[in-house]
Protein backbone atom coordinates (compact mmCIF):
# COMPACT_ATOMS: atom_id res chain seq x y z
CA UNK A 1 0.00 0.00 0.00
CA UNK A 2 1.40 3.35 -1.00
CA UNK A 3 2.41 5.61 1.78
CA UNK A 4 0.88 9.04 1.72
CA UNK A 5 3.10 11.84 0.42
CA UNK A 6 4.29 14.00 3.25
CA UNK A 7 4.82 17.64 2.43
CA UNK A 8 7.83 19.31 4.07
CA UNK A 9 7.10 21.87 6.69
CA UNK A 10 8.08 25.50 6.31
CA UNK A 11 10.79 24.94 8.93
CA UNK A 12 12.30 22.10 6.86
CA UNK A 13 12.31 24.23 3.69
CA UNK A 14 13.97 27.09 5.52
CA UNK A 15 16.74 24.83 6.83
CA UNK A 16 17.33 23.41 3.34
CA UNK A 17 17.62 26.87 1.81
CA UNK A 18 20.11 27.94 4.47
CA UNK A 19 22.23 24.80 3.99
CA UNK A 20 22.31 25.26 0.22
CA UNK A 21 23.22 28.90 0.65
CA UNK A 22 26.09 28.01 2.98
CA UNK A 23 27.31 25.36 0.57
CA UNK A 24 27.43 27.81 -2.31
CA UNK A 25 29.34 30.34 -0.23
CA UNK A 26 32.10 28.07 1.06
CA UNK A 27 35.62 28.52 -0.41
CA UNK A 28 35.55 25.15 -2.14
CA UNK A 29 32.49 26.01 -4.18
CA UNK A 30 33.90 29.37 -5.16
CA UNK A 31 37.21 27.74 -6.01
CA UNK A 32 35.43 25.36 -8.38
CA UNK A 33 33.59 28.26 -9.98
CA UNK A 34 36.81 30.21 -10.33
CA UNK A 35 38.55 27.14 -11.69
CA UNK A 36 35.90 26.71 -14.38
CA UNK A 37 36.21 30.38 -15.30
CA UNK A 38 39.99 30.09 -15.39
CA UNK A 39 39.81 27.10 -17.70
CA UNK A 40 37.56 28.95 -20.10
CA UNK A 41 39.86 31.97 -19.99
CA UNK A 42 43.00 29.86 -20.38
CA UNK A 43 42.13 28.60 -23.83
CA UNK A 44 42.77 31.92 -25.62
CA UNK A 45 46.10 32.25 -23.75
CA UNK A 46 47.29 28.92 -25.12
CA UNK A 47 46.05 29.68 -28.60
CA UNK A 48 48.94 32.00 -29.65
CA UNK A 49 51.46 29.20 -29.03
CA UNK A 50 49.53 26.84 -31.25
CA UNK A 51 49.04 29.56 -33.84
CA UNK A 52 52.75 30.37 -33.83
CA UNK A 53 53.62 26.71 -34.25
CA UNK A 54 51.23 26.39 -37.19
CA UNK A 55 52.61 29.56 -38.78
CA UNK A 56 56.19 28.32 -38.44
CA UNK A 57 55.34 24.96 -40.00
CA UNK A 58 53.53 26.62 -42.90
CA UNK A 59 56.50 28.90 -43.51
CA UNK A 60 58.83 25.89 -43.35
CA UNK A 61 56.93 24.27 -46.20
CA UNK A 62 57.24 27.45 -48.27
CA UNK A 63 60.94 27.85 -47.53
CA UNK A 64 61.68 24.26 -48.49
CA UNK A 65 59.94 24.83 -51.81
CA UNK A 66 61.58 28.23 -52.35
CA UNK A 67 65.08 26.82 -51.90
CA UNK A 68 64.25 23.58 -53.74
CA UNK A 69 65.12 21.60 -50.60
CA UNK A 70 68.75 22.70 -50.96
CA UNK A 71 70.31 22.22 -47.50
CA UNK A 72 73.10 24.75 -48.13
CA UNK A 73 70.61 27.46 -49.11
CA UNK A 74 68.34 26.73 -46.15
CA UNK A 75 71.32 26.79 -43.78
CA UNK A 76 72.62 30.11 -45.15
CA UNK A 77 69.17 31.69 -44.83
CA UNK A 78 68.78 30.45 -41.27
CA UNK A 79 72.25 31.53 -40.16
CA UNK A 80 71.73 35.07 -41.45
CA UNK A 81 68.42 35.37 -39.59
CA UNK A 82 69.92 33.80 -36.45
CA UNK A 83 72.73 36.37 -36.36
CA UNK A 84 70.29 39.25 -36.80
CA UNK A 85 67.96 37.88 -34.13
CA UNK A 86 70.78 37.34 -31.66
CA UNK A 87 72.03 40.89 -32.19
CA UNK A 88 68.55 42.33 -31.57
CA UNK A 89 68.17 40.12 -28.49
CA UNK A 90 71.49 41.48 -27.20
CA UNK A 91 70.27 45.06 -27.55
CA UNK A 92 67.01 44.14 -25.81
CA UNK A 93 68.87 42.51 -22.92
CA UNK A 94 71.14 45.54 -22.52
CA UNK A 95 67.98 47.67 -22.35
CA UNK A 96 66.56 45.22 -19.77
CA UNK A 97 63.49 44.28 -21.81
CA UNK A 98 61.99 41.26 -20.06
CA UNK A 99 59.98 40.11 -23.07
CA UNK A 100 63.23 39.18 -24.83
CA UNK A 101 63.73 36.08 -22.67
CA UNK A 102 60.96 33.99 -24.24
CA UNK A 103 61.69 35.04 -27.80
CA UNK A 104 65.43 34.52 -27.45
CA UNK A 105 64.88 31.06 -25.92
CA UNK A 106 62.67 30.10 -28.87
CA UNK A 107 65.22 31.51 -31.31
CA UNK A 108 67.99 29.40 -29.78
CA UNK A 109 65.75 26.34 -29.67
CA UNK A 110 65.33 26.48 -33.43
CA UNK A 111 68.99 27.45 -33.84
CA UNK A 112 70.01 24.21 -32.17
CA UNK A 113 68.35 22.34 -35.05
CA UNK A 114 70.78 23.68 -37.66
CA UNK A 115 73.14 20.75 -37.23
CA UNK A 116 70.67 18.45 -38.94
CA UNK A 117 71.24 17.22 -42.49
CA UNK A 118 67.52 16.61 -43.01
CA UNK A 119 66.02 19.28 -45.26
CA UNK A 120 62.64 19.19 -43.53
CA UNK A 121 64.33 19.84 -40.19
CA UNK A 122 66.47 22.60 -41.71
CA UNK A 123 63.41 24.23 -43.26
CA UNK A 124 61.61 24.13 -39.91
CA UNK A 125 64.67 25.59 -38.18
CA UNK A 126 64.94 28.35 -40.78
CA UNK A 127 61.23 29.19 -40.44
CA UNK A 128 61.36 29.23 -36.63
CA UNK A 129 64.49 31.35 -36.54
CA UNK A 130 63.06 33.87 -39.00
CA UNK A 131 59.77 33.99 -37.09
CA UNK A 132 61.35 34.81 -33.73
CA UNK A 133 64.07 37.04 -35.18
CA UNK A 134 61.30 39.11 -36.79
CA UNK A 135 59.40 39.19 -33.49
CA UNK A 136 62.49 40.33 -31.60
CA UNK A 137 63.14 43.21 -33.99
CA UNK A 138 59.49 44.27 -34.12
CA UNK A 139 59.21 44.21 -30.32
CA UNK A 140 62.41 46.21 -29.98
CA UNK A 141 61.04 48.84 -32.35
CA UNK A 142 57.58 48.94 -30.76
CA UNK A 143 58.41 48.76 -27.05
CA UNK A 144 61.98 50.00 -26.97
CA UNK A 145 62.93 53.62 -26.22
CA UNK A 146 61.26 56.20 -28.47
CA UNK A 147 64.77 57.39 -29.44
CA UNK A 148 67.57 54.89 -29.56
CA UNK A 149 71.13 54.83 -30.91
CA UNK A 150 72.81 51.46 -31.49
CA UNK A 151 76.41 50.79 -32.54
CA UNK A 152 77.57 47.41 -33.83
CA UNK A 153 81.29 46.91 -33.32
CA UNK A 154 81.49 44.07 -35.86
CA UNK A 155 79.65 46.00 -38.58
CA UNK A 156 81.14 49.36 -37.51
CA UNK A 157 77.69 50.79 -38.07
CA UNK A 158 75.55 53.26 -36.13
CA UNK A 159 71.78 53.18 -36.42
CA UNK A 160 69.50 55.76 -34.81
CA UNK A 161 65.80 54.92 -34.43
CA UNK A 162 63.02 57.43 -33.93
CA UNK A 163 59.92 55.53 -32.73
CA UNK A 164 60.97 52.49 -34.71
CA UNK A 165 61.89 54.41 -37.86
CA UNK A 166 65.51 54.47 -39.00
CA UNK A 167 66.67 58.09 -38.83
CA UNK A 168 70.43 57.61 -39.29
CA UNK A 169 72.24 54.60 -40.72
CA UNK A 170 75.96 55.33 -41.01
CA UNK A 171 79.30 53.54 -41.13
CA UNK A 172 81.63 54.51 -38.29
CA UNK A 173 85.05 53.89 -36.80
CA UNK A 174 85.28 52.93 -33.13
CA UNK A 175 88.18 52.47 -30.70
CA UNK A 176 91.31 50.51 -31.53
CA UNK A 177 91.74 47.16 -29.76
CA UNK A 178 93.91 48.63 -26.98
CA UNK A 179 91.33 51.37 -26.32
CA UNK A 180 88.15 49.71 -27.52
CA UNK A 181 84.85 51.56 -27.28
CA UNK A 182 82.93 50.43 -24.20
CA UNK A 183 80.19 47.81 -24.58
CA UNK A 184 76.78 48.08 -22.95
CA UNK A 185 73.86 50.45 -22.44
CA UNK A 186 74.91 54.07 -22.01
CA UNK A 187 73.27 57.42 -22.76
CA UNK A 188 73.99 60.86 -24.13
CA UNK A 189 75.34 62.84 -21.19
CA UNK A 190 76.39 66.13 -22.83
CA UNK A 191 76.66 67.84 -26.22
CA UNK A 192 79.30 70.36 -27.30
CA UNK A 193 79.78 72.34 -30.51
CA UNK A 194 82.47 73.15 -31.44
CA UNK A 195 84.95 71.21 -29.35
CA UNK A 196 88.70 70.60 -29.22
CA UNK A 197 89.80 67.10 -28.29
CA UNK A 198 92.78 67.20 -25.91
CA UNK A 199 94.88 64.14 -25.22
CA UNK A 200 94.54 62.78 -21.68
CA UNK A 201 97.89 61.07 -22.24
CA UNK A 202 101.17 62.99 -21.88
CA UNK A 203 103.31 63.85 -24.85
CA UNK A 204 105.66 60.99 -25.49
CA UNK A 205 103.01 58.39 -24.70
CA UNK A 206 102.14 56.09 -27.62
CA UNK A 207 98.51 57.18 -27.13
CA UNK A 208 99.20 60.94 -27.17
CA UNK A 209 97.66 63.06 -29.91
CA UNK A 210 97.73 66.81 -30.61
CA UNK A 211 94.77 69.09 -29.90
CA UNK A 212 92.14 68.13 -32.45
CA UNK A 213 89.11 70.33 -33.23
CA UNK A 214 85.77 68.76 -34.16
CA UNK A 215 82.56 70.43 -35.25
CA UNK A 216 80.33 68.70 -32.69
CA UNK A 217 80.38 65.87 -30.19
CA UNK A 218 77.71 63.95 -28.29
CA UNK A 219 79.28 62.43 -25.17
CA UNK A 220 77.90 59.08 -24.05
CA UNK A 221 80.25 58.33 -21.13
CA UNK A 222 81.96 60.37 -18.44
CA UNK A 223 85.42 59.07 -19.35
CA UNK A 224 85.77 60.72 -22.74
CA UNK A 225 83.82 58.63 -25.26
CA UNK A 226 81.65 60.51 -27.71
CA UNK A 227 80.10 60.53 -31.17
CA UNK A 228 81.80 63.13 -33.36
CA UNK A 229 82.91 64.08 -36.84
CA UNK A 230 86.49 63.37 -37.90
CA UNK A 231 87.60 65.70 -40.69
CA UNK A 232 91.00 63.97 -40.86
CA UNK A 233 89.42 60.63 -41.78
CA UNK A 234 88.05 60.06 -45.31
CA UNK A 235 84.48 58.72 -45.21
CA UNK A 236 85.56 55.89 -47.51
CA UNK A 237 87.70 54.47 -44.70
CA UNK A 238 84.80 54.12 -42.25
CA UNK A 239 83.13 50.75 -41.74
CA UNK A 240 84.00 47.12 -40.98
CA UNK A 241 87.61 46.60 -39.94
CA UNK A 242 88.36 50.31 -39.55
CA UNK A 243 88.73 49.87 -35.78
CA UNK A 244 91.95 48.03 -36.60
CA UNK A 245 93.21 50.56 -39.14
CA UNK A 246 95.19 53.82 -39.07
CA UNK A 247 92.14 55.97 -38.29
CA UNK A 248 90.94 53.90 -35.33
CA UNK A 249 89.99 56.10 -32.40
CA UNK A 250 90.99 56.17 -28.75
CA UNK A 251 87.46 55.06 -27.78
CA UNK A 252 85.25 57.63 -29.49
CA UNK A 253 83.03 56.91 -32.49
CA UNK A 254 83.92 58.71 -35.72
CA UNK A 255 80.97 59.63 -37.95
CA UNK A 256 80.42 61.42 -41.25
CA UNK A 257 79.64 65.10 -40.63
CA UNK A 258 76.10 64.81 -42.04
CA UNK A 259 75.28 61.95 -39.67
CA UNK A 260 76.62 63.60 -36.53
CA UNK A 261 74.86 66.86 -37.45
CA UNK A 262 71.52 65.05 -37.60
CA UNK A 263 72.19 63.28 -34.31
CA UNK A 264 73.28 66.50 -32.60
CA UNK A 265 70.01 68.20 -33.52
CA UNK A 266 67.81 65.17 -32.83
CA UNK A 267 69.15 63.43 -29.70
CA UNK A 268 68.39 65.06 -26.34
CA UNK A 269 70.44 64.44 -23.21
CA UNK A 270 69.53 61.00 -21.88
CA UNK A 271 69.06 59.32 -25.26
CA UNK A 272 70.08 55.64 -24.86
CA UNK A 273 73.24 54.54 -26.68
CA UNK A 274 73.77 50.77 -26.89
CA UNK A 275 77.19 49.57 -28.05
CA UNK A 276 77.20 45.83 -28.68
CA UNK A 277 79.58 43.29 -30.27
CA UNK A 278 77.18 42.55 -33.14
CA UNK A 279 79.02 39.39 -34.15
CA UNK A 280 75.91 37.21 -34.31
CA UNK A 281 76.97 35.04 -31.39
CA UNK A 282 74.42 34.02 -28.74
CA UNK A 283 73.00 36.99 -26.85
CA UNK A 284 74.38 35.65 -23.57
CA UNK A 285 77.88 35.61 -25.07
CA UNK A 286 77.58 39.18 -26.31
CA UNK A 287 76.10 40.51 -23.07
CA UNK A 288 78.98 38.91 -21.15
CA UNK A 289 81.33 41.35 -22.94
CA UNK A 290 79.74 44.34 -21.20
CA UNK A 291 82.29 46.84 -19.89
CA UNK A 292 79.96 49.23 -18.06
CA UNK A 293 78.32 48.85 -14.68
CA UNK A 294 74.57 48.71 -14.00
CA UNK A 295 74.38 52.52 -14.16
CA UNK A 296 76.17 52.64 -17.53
CA UNK A 297 79.47 53.86 -16.10
CA UNK A 298 82.47 52.46 -18.03
CA UNK A 299 84.93 50.31 -16.14
CA UNK A 300 87.68 50.66 -18.74
CA UNK A 301 89.35 53.92 -17.75
CA UNK A 302 89.96 57.12 -19.67
CA UNK A 303 89.25 57.44 -23.40
CA UNK A 304 89.44 60.23 -25.93
CA UNK A 305 89.47 61.36 -29.58
Per-segment meaning from a language model:
Residues 1-7:
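N-terminal secretory signal peptides that target proteins for export/translocation
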Residues 10-14:
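N-terminal export leaders
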Residues 17-21, 58, 62-75, 79-84, ...:
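Exported/periplasmic cell-wall-interacting domains
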Residues 21-32:
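Hydrophobic alpha-helical membrane-insertion segments, chiefly the h-region
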Residues 32-106, 125-129:
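Amphipathic alpha-helical assembly segments used for oligomerization, scaffolding, or translocation
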Residues 92-93, 114-115, 144-147, 215, ...:
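Second-shell loop/turn segments in exported
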Residues 107, 111-148:
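Long amphipathic alpha-helical scaffold segments
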Residues 134-239, 264-265, 298-304:
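Gly/Pro-biased beta-strand-loop elements
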